Amino acid sequence: MIEKLRTIRKNSLKEIPDLSEKDLNYPISYWIKEDRLLNERGKEFTIILRTRGCRWALGEQGGCSMCGYIRDSYIETLESHYIKNQFLNAWNAKIEEIEKDEFNFIIKIFNSGSFFDDEEINEDVRAFIYEKISQVDKIKEVVVESRVEFLNETNLKKMKEKLGNKHIEIAIGLETANDHIRINYLNKGLLYDDFLSVVQLIRKNQLGIRVYLLLKPPFLNERSAIDDCVASIKKMIGLKVNTISINPVNIQKGTLVDYLWKKKLYRPPWFYSLIKCLNSAITSQELLGYTRIVSDPSGAGTIRGIHNCNDKFCNDKMKEVVRNFVLTQDVNEIRYVEEQIECDCKLKYHIQNIYI
């Protein structure tokens, strides 16, 4: 599989367009929208920075089988002032709105790689970002993401020192608690024991842990995908991570999953499956007493993202259910949902779930 991943990645990198000076000074994207904070409804301010890209994706192993974010990267080393300008352009565009808003905020700084990889975002840039965030009281929570190999005590201590008045979460793409699936189907290059070691390191430095779980990795059918996701959610709740983010696969260009989908060997998960995962794993409201569970699926309702059928109403209803659950953290929002959906696709789903 690694050889196939390398070939797909190599061809995908050839399709990356040349970027202008303006492109390098502006982030890939940024936005504000409703989100769930630890103990309240609030809003998120998300900034996606353009860096040289994930080192794992650029390496000899070919990257993860489902991730195509490297296509948004610059590939070459990007000087610090470009990253600072990207952050500033997003920051300056939204900071007045944030300070005037009635809601509190969570800021998410993503770079489609690792925030603590110095080849993507160096210490000087990180300190610059911390300084800006620390000055805004409306921002109560901070999320950054990283592969485990770039997490160390020095980096975590510096972040804690600069942002000690905020709730900080380090997001890790564990994807599944099953080593076999993560290594052989996702090519993640991460063992569960390594994840546990980093969890201890993060907790030692009094920071929070956010775990990404993937719904329906390639080579799993719908039933197996549900079982894997439920088992992983339960394990993370037992581990008392601060946040679980469930990410149903969306088919990104230039990936092995995209290749399988085009060969009709893969279908994104059904919304019914996501609801089933949540109901099976969260058997009582008390389980959400410490861990919040969120899901904001990319491409939801499209053929490349999580969807039920081609009926817009059916998909929109399911998106609404998931969104209401995330914002309220009330398990009643996901109970008996399927019974309330009057759509012919339910029968097709159950037949496939049993026999395929």
Task: Outline where the language-model segments fall.
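Auxiliary Fe-S-binding modules of radical SAM enzymes
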Residues: 1-18, 26, 251-356
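Hydrophobic faces of well-ordered beta-strands that scaffold small-molecule active sites
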Residues: 43-47, 105-109, 142-144, 168-172, ...
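Core AdoMet radical
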Residues: 70-90, 94, 98-123, 136-151, ...
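Structural recognition of alpha->loop->beta junctions
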Residues: 64, 135-138, 227-245, 314-341
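Canonical Radical SAM [4Fe-4S] cluster-binding loop centered on the CxxxCxxC motif
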Residues: 30, 36-85
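Distinct, well-ordered alpha-helical segments
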Residues: 119-127, 152-162, 223
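Conserved C-terminal portion of the radical SAM core fold
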Residues: 193-255, 275-297
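Acidic (Asp/Glu)-rich catalytic clusters
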Residues: 94-102, 129-137, 157-167, 200-206, ...
